[in-house]
């Protein structure tokens, strides 16, 4: 397996030349465009890795699956999905268009920015510090990584430049989707996107979902139903507005982030973490997508 991963990383590294690192958030543009790495964690405890698997990066939108889990644990499935839908939007992740033009004013799903901001507003706590502290501790628990922390520079960059996110949040407040303090919800959201980890971190997160919400030590954190909800939304909405194409090409539940990460889940088998900050036009890791496509074909991982 290790040799296969090494071979696939080298084969697909050429695709990094065809994309670009995210540059609309200060600090993200400092990533090495040519970087590509992968980490695989199996349910029976084996670990395999190749390439730039140890490079730290901010998980960005991969955090949306973590905040969704915590929001459901805090409030229950019925409440969360009364505020946020489950349908693909077909629009870019930062689009505001359907919020106003759709007959239903709630965000289409929790994987687009508007939906994730609404989800962040549902995390329990007396203020944004307590809410984010709970979220970070929950992330450490399910990734089994106590070194997870906030990249403060990127958080400030997110907060200083996220004007479209501010506009979405205030619109959601006006529609009654966000019930609490708007700025607290945004602070939690910007901070969760700025959590820093490695390919191993998101590989372990993938393994947690592959094991239906059970940690390596056997402790159950999510119900089986909750784990299924998260994995289903990863398939239908996890790769932004190329989720359908990715499902056809790769066929495993995955969630990407503009920091270059992709967290993938092979149910009952393994979690996969990929890092490649050179992005395609949809905001997904370009070489990372090709790498996962090859790995899925080689190991027959497609769930369909």
From Swiss-Prot:
It comes from the Bacteria. One of its GO terms (molecular function) is glutaminase activity. Keywords: Hydrolase. Coiled coil: none annotated. It is an enzyme of class 3 (hydrolase). Belongs to the glutaminase family. This is Glutaminase. The lineage of its organism: Bacteria, Fusobacteriati, Fusobacteriota, Fusobacteriia, Fusobacteriales.
